[in-house]
């Protein structure tokens, strides 16, 4: 679906106080031009951008989320927070894709306080990209309410996601290439699915049940899952006491 010609995106920007925010300030002082789509939230470090911030911004129908931090190696904090932001961005994009949100709506960039023109270039490029994608949900071909439900399910699991990141997603090489290699390697996919995506799927199933759906078939159709996948997750949820299954009616209800 083509974006309306008068569409003006809303981009939530989380900017590092020491570098990217300074670059944005220099951009304004120098009168470099970029689209007025950005809504700035200044943070002390890009590593402070929690997964919850990203999911909540999209749940509130932001069309794009931008994270701007110091160049790697220039972070003012130890251990370097921008590596935390880099790891979070890899995880967030995979989760967004699983929910159905186009991961290109999230962008992470390094901009120093002296790079006003670079800030303008990045925002012009990202602004054009978001404008081409259209309003949140349009390029995805999904109902906004369904995307919001997925984001809410992900948001509820953020504490668990952070624990997994800390304990299981330890990147051996603290370089940008090291992070790309770790999150892009072939054996990372089954690890991510088992630890993150399966948990997210169960959270989304629980959310669907709360809306009044009461059978595996209805849940599978609503979420676009395979019926067998839903049945397997429901079996695990039942073992954990999270749902009750009425075998005679093949109906499922959230446990009290």
Task: Report the location of each language-model feature.
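Iron-sulfur-associated redox domains of electron-transfer enzymes in respiratory
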Residues: 1-222, 226-235, 256
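A short, conserved structural fragment
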Residues: 238-249
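Minor-groove-contacting beta-hairpin "wing" of winged helix-turn-helix DNA-binding domains
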Residues: 249-255
């Amino acid at each position: 679906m083509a974006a309306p010609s008068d569409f003006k995106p809303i981009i939530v920007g989380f900017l590092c106080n020491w570098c990217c925010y300074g670059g944005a300030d220099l951009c304004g002082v120098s009168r470099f031009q970029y689209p007025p789509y950005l809504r700035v939230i200044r943070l002390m470090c890009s590593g402070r951008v929690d997964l919850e911030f990203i999911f909540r911004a999209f749940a509130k129908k932001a069309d794009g989320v931008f994270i701007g931090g110091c160049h790697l190696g220039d972070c003012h904090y130890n251990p370097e927070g921008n590596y935390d932001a880099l790891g979070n961005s890899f995880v967030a994009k995979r989760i967004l894709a699983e929910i159905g949100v186009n991961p290109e709506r999230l962008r992470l960039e390094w901009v120093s306080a002296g790079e006003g023109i670079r800030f303008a270039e990045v925002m012009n490029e990202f602004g054009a990209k978001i404008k081409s994608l259209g309003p949140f949900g349009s390029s995805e071909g999904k109902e906004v309410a369904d995307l919001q439900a997925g984001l809410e399910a992900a948001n509820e699991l953020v504490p668990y996601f952070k624990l997994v990141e800390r304990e299981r997603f330890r990147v051996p090489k603290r370089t940008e290439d090291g992070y790309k290699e770790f999150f892009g390697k072939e054996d990372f996919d089954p690890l991510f699915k088992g630890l993150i995506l399966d948990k997210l799927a169960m959270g989304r199933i629980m959310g669907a049940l709360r809306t009044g759906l009461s059978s595996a078939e209805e849940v599978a159709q609503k979420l676009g899952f395979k019926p067998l996948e839903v049945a397997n997750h429901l079996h695990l949820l039942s073992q954990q006491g999270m749902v009750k299954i009425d075998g005679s009616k093949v109906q499922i209800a959230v446990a009290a």
